[in-house]
Amino acid sequence: MADRRRRLRPGTLAPVREGVNCRSRCFTKHKNGLKFPTSLHSRQLVFPRKGLDDFRKGCPPCTGLVTQVPVEGFLPQIYHRAPQLAPKKRQIKLLKEADVLSKLSPAQQARKAFLEDVEAHLTPHPLALYLNLEEAMPIELLSKVLEVLDPDRKLEDTWAYCQDTRKGMKEPTKLLKKHSTQVYLGPSKKTSVSNAGQWLYEEKPHKMDLLHENGPRPGLHENGISDIDEEFILKQFDIDYETKPSHDALHTMKLNQVPLELKRSVGLSKLQETEFFQKLGYERKLQKPQNPYKPKWVKMRYGAWYLNPKLWKKQRVDEPLVDPEVSHKAQEENFKKELQEQEELLADLHGTVAFKDFILSRGYRTPRFLENMYIGKECKRACNKTPIKRTQA
């Protein structure tokens, strides 16, 4: 035990002489050990030149394909300090002609451009559906619409129309001298057009002003006599039926807003009009608004207690209750009538006649359905031939 304790005591080891191999497993040396492979040496690796796999601007040039050794090492570099971030490179802006990140060859890009050009010529212009767009829109709004939808100015007529009208509006117009004693006919109407949250107003000339441009305006003479006659007043209320109908927009009107001339053409008098409108209002009050989400509730029944439950049938309560035996008999009669009608149609056909002649020529037994068919037909003919006896009164 004492010897064992001495061995386990900590002590200093003597230095090992040079050239002496240590028997410990941790320091064993292998004479035929594996050498470091040269393929993993970063200085001997060879890489292709940068930019050979970039096909964004087309195929790379065939010249200068010499490979070169990378400047940086293959193995990771260990920094004793925090590594500095590399400066960000500016993204190279490609030309408009070259598609961004496109993998197409120049021939494919040319074909794609040709197809887009053909489709652009074939597709109709967005303003081609609106024929009366010039008359319906004010000039300022029409010019803004054209700038958005037709930037290339393909619609030359509409652009010329806008420019001509703008020039006419800018030119000074001749104002008529208005006398203080002339009749005032009211301000001009304003038509509002909503566009992108803004209201644009276009002042349209009044119909009465257009009438006075052609003829003299009524006024007072020096004697105090006015030119306003009965004919002049009737002309003001005259309706022009030769105006262009606007098919683009549908103007809905209520029954109260219908003009008197249309009511007279229909033939409604004043009393009939009041009764008609009163009936409409009363009917609307009686009609309750139906909720489409709630289905209509219908009461159903399946039969009576005194009938056989096997013969019950689902039906509504308001429908009359029919005896199932009677309904069964009626169905049988209807079925027999349909069969008779079909037999009559088949008996007149050429196929059935030829089939009957074939059976008789061969001496076969005629089937029962053919016999019944022709028996019924002969009975019908006999009934039609027999004269009806008239009883003398």
From Swiss-Prot:
Q: Please provide the Gene Ontology terms (biological process) for this protein.
A: protein localization to chromatin; transcription initiation-coupled chromatin remodeling
Quote the cellular component terms of the Gene Ontology held in the record: chromatin; cytoplasm; nucleus
Subcellular location per the Swiss-Prot or TrEMBL entry: Nucleus; Chromosome; Cytoplasm
Listed A to Z, the keywords are: Chromatin regulator, Chromosome, Coiled coil, Cytoplasm, Nucleus
Q: Which domain of life is it from?
A: Eukaryota
Q: Which Pfam families match?
A: FAM47 (PF14642)
Does this UniProt record's set of keywords contain Coiled coil? yes
Q: Which residues form a coiled coil?
A: 326-354
Kindly indicate whether the keyword Cell cycle belongs to this entry: no
A single GO molecular function term of this UniProt record: enzyme activator activity
The task this protein performs is described as: Promotes histone methylation by localizing the arginine methyltransferase PRMT5 to chromatin.
UniProt family annotation: Belongs to the FAM47 family.
| Assembly | Interacts with PRMT5; the interaction is direct. Interacts with WDR77.
Name of the protein described by the UniProt record: Protein FAM47E
Q: What gene does the UniProt entry assign to this protein?
A: FAM47E
